[in-house]
Curated annotation (Swiss-Prot):
Keywords: Ribonucleoprotein, Ribosomal protein. This is Large ribosomal subunit protein bL28. GO terms for cellular component: cytosolic large ribosomal subunit. It comes from Shewanella sediminis (strain HAW-EB3). InterPro entries: Ribosomal_bL28 (IPR026569), Ribosomal_bL28/bL31-like_sf (IPR034704), Ribosomal_bL28_bact-type (IPR001383), Ribosomal_bL28_sf (IPR037147). The gene is rpmB. Pfam families: Ribosomal_L28. Belongs to the bacterial ribosomal protein bL28 family. Residues 1-23 are annotated as: Disordered.
Length: 78
């Protein structure tokens, strides 16, 4: 399973660890992904999404029905 948010599309970024001596080593910054189950009232069923915490805030703002409709319009299977 890839580390990509289904709502926002957030992916891992690359950057550097910095030691006290300013040495740099490459590292990955991973998005804060959560597996979450949402109830779709219109379909009377649960939907499982792998979303970031930012995606959860978007769902709180817009509503799960609107977000799922946008995902389906993009061609994602939900």
């Amino acid at each position: 399973m890839s580390r990509v948010c289904q709502v926002t599309g957030k992916k891992p970024m690359v950057g550097n660890n910095r030691s006290h001596a300013k040495n740099s080593t490459r590292r990955r910054f991973l998005p804060n992904l959560q597996n979450h189950r949402f109830w779709l009232e219109g379909e009377k069923r649960f939907v499982k999404l792998r979303i970031s915490t930012k995606g959860m805030r978007i769902i709180d703002k817009k509503g799960i029905e609107v977000v799922v409709a946008e995902l389906r319009a993009r061609g994602e299977k939900v």
